[in-house]
Amino acid sequence: MIQSTGVTHTDKSAQENPVKYRDNFTPVIITGMSGAGLSTAARVLEDLGWYVAHNIPPQIILELIDMCAREDSPVDKVAVVCDVRSREFRGSLTQVVSELRDKQLDPTVLFLEARDEVLIKRFDNVRRTHPLQGSQTLQVGIERERTVLSPVKEDASVVIDTSDLSVHDLRRAIESSFRTIATRTQHVTIESFGFKHGSPRDADFVVDVRFLPNPFWVPELRPFRGVDKPVSDYVLSQKGAEEFLNNFVDMLKDMLPGYRHEGKNFITIGVGCTGGHHRSVAVSEELAKRIADQTTLDVSVVHRDINRH
């Protein structure tokens, strides 16, 4: 007997000839908020050579991935897109992920989200209704979806907030993440931001560099940004900057073995200052250089608010 979820085999021949899965097979499940960029994520993975199945109900995901993972399967990389348009979504996706892990087919769950006001604007732009709004408002539909997806997000391998990302930014973020999956390395994203615009929602931890003097108050530096050498030299030469950078990199190196043991291959560090133009940008760039030089991590840098007013 084979059931869609909670697969149970009572077939004697199956017991005598256990299924053989290919080595290093890592399936991907793409999910998240409607309007957050699931279709873009799917296209990126297709361009990277993944076989992508769209809008697959959770009860079918287990069977599809099991089939693709077998040694005799012609598909070596598979990703499935699963969203709340599937009536069976509620509660069942987390169950499927758990069952895949029990079968040693540990999936990478990519979860995309965005702020409510951003999602509302995106839906308004394309003149579409939300799949869960029914006869209610768009805001109600988004709130319902966030509640449904909360346990999925908590268990996700990679969470990307697309609120402030262009399509090209999202593509780069996904490409970087999935190169990491292919090579089995750990990846750290350093994201500079301005506290006045809010902290990154997908950061694992946040660093506040407002203890450093603000170049904004130096007239000749104000027009520049933290990626420019005059600002970078000013920020990094301030008292406490060198000590902070050394201590932070040392702390991260101490944490890496624990992260690796827990299977956490994606680490996001938010580095914040007031506006996200000067101090956080300069410190993020320098942190990225030092982490790349002193660890085996793949490193990428995102300056979320560098052009934001």
From Swiss-Prot:
Record's family?
Belongs to the RapZ-like family.
The protein, known as: Nucleotide-binding protein Cgl1591/cg1794
* Originating organism: Corynebacterium glutamicum (strain ATCC 13032 / DSM 20300 / JCM 1318 / BCRC 11384 / CCUG 27702 / LMG 3730 / NBRC 12168 / NCIMB 10025 / NRRL B-2784 / 534)
Name a GO molecular-function annotation: ATP binding
Q: Which Pfam families match?
A: PapZ_C, RapZ-like_N
Sites binding ATP sit at G32, M33, S34, G35, A36, G37, L38, S39
Keyword GTP-binding listed? The answer is yes
Q: Which UniProt keywords apply?
A: ATP-binding, GTP-binding, Nucleotide-binding
